[in-house]
Amino acid sequence: MSATAALGIVPPPAPISDAFRSTMRRFPATVTIISACRNGTDHGMTATAVTSLSMDPPSLLICLNNRTYLHDMLLEVPEFAVSILTDRQVALSEGFSGKIAPERRFEAADWVRHARGMMVLDSAHASVVCRRMGAVPYGTHTIFIGQVVDTRFSQDTIPLMYENSKYCAPQHALPTSQN
């Protein structure tokens, strides 16, 4: 029985799935690399399904396809890291999306080993290290909840974004009613 059937989820008709996929492609998302280490083996992959969850306790969630190697790894390891890429790291994103063999991915760029064991990108726009607090399967993906144990950020970089199958970056801040 599939995870979808086990949860009682009825797959939508193809036209809704296709329309939803097209709609979601238009949601701009920050590009990240999620990394973890299991038994001395590092692994990481590019992901955009990352969001803050709570400030008390500080936490975020990531969503990973159930068929990925990192998904299985995160079910076993207690912690993971999220490195938010800069607008100058498109090639790194592509490499961690499959253009570089998994065992060679951390040879590119300035990865450093965090005190908790996993690799974190030193030149990232921001990075967050989390303790895995939960994993909720839903359909083809699992939502991993991470409680923040460490974080750092740069004041001088621009985040890399992805929208409609293209990399992009914020151009400028727009005025708000407060400024």
Where are each of the predicted segments found?
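Basic, polyanion-binding surface patches
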Residues: S2-N179
